[in-house]
Amino acid sequence: MNRFVYITEYLPKRYSASPEQDNARRMCWDFKKGILSDRVRDAFISKVRAIQNDSGKRCMVCFIPASTKEKTILRFSRLSSALKTEGFDVEEHAVFNTSDREAEHINGKSDNPTRTFGFNESKIRERIIILIDDIFTRGRTFNQTAAKLKEMGAIDVIGLFLAKTVNPDYHQADRGSNVINSEYEPDVEVIYLDDMEFEMEYNQYPIYNPDEEYMAEDLDQFDPDFEDLDCYDDNPENELY
């Protein structure tokens, strides 16, 4: 079972959002476009430091590639530089694009979304890896990438995401609880951010509670290129998920 940390929550566009949830959406859209706010940068730095301290060993930071090399560089280059400045071990070439792939919401879902990823075994072996990406929904790409890293000798792989998708339809609202319907439980374990305590996701549902209002550029008409599987559902309109 793979573990992951996330910083905030992403509510899909089809749901009416509070001002705080709308701010979180815009923060995610900005990050997709390569905009790294001070708030997001500092949150990633804090979580990488917490994971490394919890592991008791020096970790290596890697990134899950986007659909193209260009998008991977755009999305993660500023964060990579910020983490290096803080003294973390960041390796952009441990997991990398071997070729560009068409976005899965255009071309259909692949049985193996990592088919266009390359892995540098010499950089992976005997390392604890913090694997960063933007949004976690079902976790298929993360789990398959983590499995490949472990196959190549990684000691452990811990995911770190800017946001986790929340979907009110999948909660047992009739019970008045925050228990996630077992049908939609991903094969992961959440590391909660407050104290790094390991809890199963269905035992506690974290509520988004931002410390400050997030102001982004005017993105009211922006339809972000959420090209990866974890941002889409199966509907024909390709609504953000």
Residue ranges: model-predicted function:
Residues 188-241:
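DE-rich, low-complexity intrinsically disordered acidic tracts
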Residues 93, 97-204, 238:
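PRPP/pyrophosphate-binding module of the type I phosphoribosyltransferase fold
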Residues 58, 87-90, 154-156:
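A generic structural signal for alpha->beta connector loops
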Residues 1-60, 95-125, 165:
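Active-site-facing substrate-recognition patch
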Residues 63-67, 162-163:
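Short loop/turn motifs enriched for small/polar and acidic residues
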Residues 60-65, 130-131:
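Acidic beta-strand-to-loop metal/phosphate-binding motif
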Residues 65-75:
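Glycine-rich phosphate-binding loops at beta-strand->alpha-helix junctions
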Residues 74-90:
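Glycine-rich phosphate-binding loop and adjoining helix at the ATP-binding site
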